């Protein structure tokens, strides 16, 4: 039977009251806002608590909220197959010191997710065993999923707009 969100939140707040900044529920899914320095403690508690048993890290990702403080957020989705329940943990990450502790010690599968988040957003996962780029070339400058990265794409030429686009190209015309 699925765990009630209120029960999960109550157990979490009772065990780690100083780690929780807030919570929200949307369409039946519980999100808990966690202090960055306490994410490992919260994740370990959710994994190891005999009643909760959120023992599967489904994924984690970065989000860029340009213009908001904190600018970045790392979002973790955990599943308890035993209790048929999910929980979302959200950690705010400062733009000027974009770091959060790594969860690879709890879930080795976090390795590639954290590397991708580092590569795309520049969020540093302290304690990660091999925090290197995973998608972009090693000599790539910047982090392409940040919202302040300039878009340098060219408009694609189709039959309806090719004359306008080709008029600005430096190649020879027939």
Curated annotation (Swiss-Prot):
Q: Which GO terms describe its molecular function?
A: NADH dehydrogenase (ubiquinone) activity; NADH:ubiquinone reductase (non-electrogenic) activity; quinone binding
Subunit field text: NDH-1 is composed of 14 different subunits. Subunits NuoB, C, D, E, F, and G constitute the peripheral sector of the complex.
Query: Gene encoding it?
Result: nuoC
**Principal EC category:** translocase
State its Enzyme Commission number(s): 7.1.1.-
Reaction(s) catalysed by this chain, per the record, are: a quinone + NADH + 5 H(+)(in) = a quinol + NAD(+) + 4 H(+)(out)
Q: Mind telling me which Pfam families this protein's record contains?
A: Complex1_30kDa
- Is Membrane included in the keywords of this UniProt record? yes
* Keywords tagged on the record: Cell membrane, Membrane, NAD, Quinone, Translocase, Transport, Ubiquinone
Name of the protein this chain belongs to: NADH-quinone oxidoreductase subunit C
Q: Where in the cell is it found?
A: Cell membrane
Describe its function: NDH-1 shuttles electrons from NADH, via FMN and iron-sulfur (Fe-S) centers, to quinones in the respiratory chain. The immediate electron acceptor for the enzyme in this species is believed to be ubiquinone. Couples the redox reaction to proton translocation (for every two electrons transferred, four hydrogen ions are translocated across the cytoplasmic membrane), and thus conserves the redox energy in a proton gradient.
For this UniProt entry, what is the primary localization, expressed as one broad class? membrane
Q: Which SUPFAM superfamilies match?
A: Nqo5-like
The record describes its membrane topology as: Peripheral membrane protein
Q: Name one GO cellular component term.
A: plasma membrane
Sequence similarity: Belongs to the complex I 30 kDa subunit family.
UniProt xrefs under Gene3D superfamilies: NADH:ubiquinone oxidoreductase, 30kDa subunit
């Amino acid at each position: 039977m699925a765990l009630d969100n209120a029960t999960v939140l109550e157990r979490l707040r009772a065990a780690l009251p100083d780690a929780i900044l807030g919570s929200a529920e949307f369409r039946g899914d519980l999100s808990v806002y966690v202090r960055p320095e306490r994410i490992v403690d919260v994740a370990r508690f959710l994994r190891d608590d005999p009643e909760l048993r959120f023992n599967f890290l489904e994924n984690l990702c970065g989000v860029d909220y340009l213009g908001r403080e904190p600018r970045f957020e790392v979002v973790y989705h955990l599943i308890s197959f035993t209790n048929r329940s999910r929980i979302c943990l959200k950690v705010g990450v400062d733009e000027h010191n974009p770091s959060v502790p790594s969860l690879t010690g709890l879930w080795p599968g976090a390795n590639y997710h954290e590397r991708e988040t580092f590569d795309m957003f520049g969020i540093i996962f302290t304690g990660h065993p091999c925090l290197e780029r995973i998608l972009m070339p090693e000599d790539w400058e910047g982090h392409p999923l940040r919202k302040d990265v300039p878009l340098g794409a060219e408009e694609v030429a189709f039959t309806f707009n090719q004359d306008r686009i080709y008029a600005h190209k430096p190649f020879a015309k027939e």
